[in-house]
Amino acid sequence: MALRTKLKDTAQQLAGDLKVKDIRIGLCYTAVQLDNGQLGLAYTFCDSLTGGCSVFDTSQTIAGRPAKELLSLFDSDNLIASAVALATANALLNSSHHAYVPGPAVEQIQFYPDDQVGMIGNFSPLVRGIRPRVKQLYIFERQARLDESILGLAMTEELLPKCQVALITATAIINGSIDRLLSLTANCRAVIILGTSTPLCREVFEETPVTLLSGVVAKNAEKLLQVVSEGGGTPAFKQAVDKVNLVIGPNTQCYD
């Protein structure tokens, strides 16, 4: 089963009769708040916006709709719709009631001097802490920037299977590349999904190579809605979220 499908099905089981109270599609992030007060975030791929007067082909407002309806947007190829679906799922899944491990993801990972590490998405604050501790750190982005030692995503096919540790941006769930990336990490000792868009749910990832989920739990919904509406990113809302980690466990099954 595709991971997006499993994520949709799992979140729909929690949605019940919950409805969308508020939604903001910002330049950097998308926020969805449910009528129980819970809020979820997901990255906005602004460069995927097309011309026209509306993001969605509808004359109806989104606020007030059932959460289950927004989760069905996981079936869409539209990256903005996918972000709305993931933000809705995160509002349902990223609850403060779980037993999380606090702190940065890098503190939860054991690196060795001979490790080759693949990082999908340039998490620049983590690079300085990882590169001196390992043999090689490969950074992959949609656009290669060789002057900054950043490789194109096509190079993951060759290099990711050689890595012992993989750090994958959760935006791969939004753009649909997550399944292929996980298939390339089947031999990794540790696979971490990280970023603000990360859905914190063991059930979704328990049959994949993923060993750790690193994301956020909203603690000030009003502040987050304001920041997203104003086009702000992670520096602007870091006081309104808790950065947490959820341990999945060792990889016991290959990802199919």
Regions found by a protein language model. Give the residues of each.
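A short helix->loop->beta-strand "cap" motif at the edges of active sites that frequently abuts
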Residues: 134-135, 186-190, 210
